[in-house]
């Protein structure tokens, strides 16, 4: 009999790489029909532990027990066939195939016709329809995957896992690209899976989600097992202190900036793109952190991309230091001292195969090109080294490919890139998305220091504690319209939500 309904035990798992002890005697016990959150900063060993479970890595020590039997999977396929599935943060379905073909890829049902085995499309359709129905997903099995939303693709991956009769499903940052309604739907699916006895290993940095969905929480730090707790008795501060290894006194730096005169003024801005936002007016002061809040779909990103020159404006005016400016492209924006850190760091922020050094200076290459149109390596290297030192970028070398850095260090490189262009206004779209709690504080400190230096910050964030903790004022959008502006020190989550839903 399986003790305490435990379906999976990982006991004393250790894994060494040359010069690095990635896992040091880690334990994980997961119960049937529960959501078990696995938490830790980037580099804590969560991914390595899951790779040991899936047979991608072979552990150097320890044992894995599944359903009371000791196992050692040869590869991910072996794990899948034994009832363990994983839904990755980066979803990779086959876009130009149907939903049902993606679900049953590599194991299409076959029927005999004149002695020949051919794909039984009718059975595949019916099986997929039944599967999606059980998950309360209203999708035609014949729909091309390329036509699905992100949440529907995620649902497809869950359906695929269920089709393997998975006893355990690992979900890695499953809500990172979902709207609030889509998150609610995902949680409903997870609840149904729990009722069917499926165990969910849930990896996320989002504290409020963990406290809402998880039954138990296991925390790792520096490749070590810190402990497992029932989620019901935990708080956000307690989780963070266990993750970072110190008591949490302040999640955000103290506000020591003093906003000065108006540096940017936006008047009656309306988008040329089907009026996705309309009649937006606001002011930004020197040294101010202006937060922008709102639900997904409020058109916050569209607004800041239009200010930066990435999108066309139909009507309205932008003033910099009292002078009206026409910003038609990011090159114009840079000339007027405006920088933009985009929301999607991996796809539009970094150049993944370029080095840390190249990513640092790429926005200001004109500074390093001499009269012979040759890059002045000495001048470039000086700025690269200064940036790495000032922003405490943790990298083996400036020649390391940026894709090998953690999310927090990648974000610091993007900060350094734009700081070298000497901007007066920095627009940041979700600057801490996908970054662990320890690195978040470092990013907050950089933003705070920049505001104290007189830099003006526009910061979009979907995390209300972040908006309240960092902003001098919070501008809230709803359905493409400005619904209110609140002083940061007076803001509450309830008031932000009231304005965020004002026009819905």
Curated annotation (Swiss-Prot):
InterPro entries: AAA+_ATPase, ABC_carbohydrate_import_ATPase, ABC_transporter-like_ATP-bd, ABC_transporter-like_CS, P-loop_NTPase. It is found in: Cell membrane. The keyword Cytoplasm does not apply. CDD domains: ABC_Carb_Monos_I, ABC_Carb_Monos_II. It is a peripheral membrane protein. The keyword Nucleotide-binding applies. It catalyses: D-galactose(out) + ATP + H2O = D-galactose(in) + ADP + phosphate + H(+); methyl beta-D-galactoside(out) + ATP + H2O = methyl beta-D-galactoside(in) + ADP + phosphate + H(+). GO terms for molecular function: ATP binding; ATP hydrolysis activity. GO terms for cellular component: plasma membrane. Its EC number is 7.5.2.11. It is an enzyme of class 7 (translocase). ATP binds at residues 40-47. SUPFAM superfamilies: P-loop containing nucleoside triphosphate hydrolases. Residues 8-247, 258-504 form the ABC transporter domain. Keywords: ATP-binding, Cell membrane, Membrane, Nucleotide-binding, Repeat, Sugar transport, Translocase, Transport. It holds the Pfam family ABC_tran. The complex is composed of one ATP-binding protein (MglA), two transmembrane proteins (MglC) and a solute-binding protein (MglB). Part of the ABC transporter complex MglABC involved in galactose/methyl galactoside import. Responsible for energy coupling to the transport system. Belongs to the ABC transporter superfamily. Galactose/methyl galactoside importer (TC 3.A.1.2.3) family. This is Galactose/methyl galactoside import ATP-binding protein MglA.
């Amino acid at each position: 009999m399986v003790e305490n309904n435990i379906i999976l035990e990982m006991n004393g798992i250790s894994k060494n790489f040359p010069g690095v002890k990635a896992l040091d005697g880690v334990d994980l016990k997961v119960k049937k029909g529960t959501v078990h959150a696995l938490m830790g900063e980037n580099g804590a060993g969560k991914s390595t532990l899951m790779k040991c479970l899936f047979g991608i890595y072979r552990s150097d020590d320890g044992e894995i027990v599944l359903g009371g039997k000791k196992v050692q999977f040869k590869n991910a396929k072996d794990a899948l066939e034994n009832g363990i599935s994983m839904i990755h943060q980066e979803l990779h379905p086959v876009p130009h195939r149907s939903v049902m073909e993606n679900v049953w890829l590599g194991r299409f049902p076959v029927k005999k016709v004149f002695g020949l085995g051919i794909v039984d499309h009718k059975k595949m359709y019916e099986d997929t329809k039944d599967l999606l129905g059980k998950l309360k997903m209203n999708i035609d099995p014949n729909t091309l995957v390329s036509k699905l939303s992100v949440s529907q693709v995620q649902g497809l991956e869950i359906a695929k896992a269920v089709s393997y009769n998975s006893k355990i499903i690992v979900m890695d940052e499953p809500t990172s690209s979902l709207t609030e309604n889509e998150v609610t739907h995902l949680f409903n699916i997870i609840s149904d899976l729990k009722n069917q006895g499926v165990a969910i290993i849930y990896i996320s940095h989002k504290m409020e989600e963990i406290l809402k969905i998880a039954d138990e929480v296991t925390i790792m730090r520096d490749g070590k097992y810190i402990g497992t707790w029932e989620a019901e008795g935990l708080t956000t501060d307690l989780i963070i202190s266990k993750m970072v290894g110190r008591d949490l006194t302040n999640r955000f730096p103290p506000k020591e900036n003093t906003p000065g005169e108006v540096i940017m003024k936006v008047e009656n801005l309306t988008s040329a793109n089907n009026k996705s936002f309309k009649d937006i007016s606001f002011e930004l002061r020197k040294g101010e952190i202006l937060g922008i809040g709102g639900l997904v779909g409020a058109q916050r990103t569209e607004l800041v991309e239009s200010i930066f020159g990435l999108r066309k404006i139909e009507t309205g005016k932008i003033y910099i230091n009292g002078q009206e400016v026409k910003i038609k492209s990011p090159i114009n924006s840079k000339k007027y001292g405006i920088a933009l850190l985009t929301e999607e760091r991996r796809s539009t922020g970094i150049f993944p195969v370029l080095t840390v050094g190249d990513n640092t200076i790429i926005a200001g290459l004109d500074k390093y090109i001499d009269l012979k149109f040759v890059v002045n390596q000495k001048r470039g290297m000086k700025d690269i080294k200064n940036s790495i030192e000032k922003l405490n970028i943790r990298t083996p070398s400036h020649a390391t490919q940026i894709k090998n850095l953690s999310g927090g260090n990648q974000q610091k490189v993007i900060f350094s890139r734009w700081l070298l262009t000497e901007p007066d206004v920095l627009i940041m779209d979700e600057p801490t998305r996908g970054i662990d709690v320890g690195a978040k504080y470092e990013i907050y400190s950089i933003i705070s220091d920049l505001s104290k230096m007189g830099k003006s910050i526009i910061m979009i964030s979907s995390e209300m504690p972040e908006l309240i903790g960092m902003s001098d004022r919070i501008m809230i959008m709803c359905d493409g319209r400005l619904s209110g502006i609140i002083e940061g020190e007076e803001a509450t989550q309830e008031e932000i939500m009231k304005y965020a839903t004002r026009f819905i």
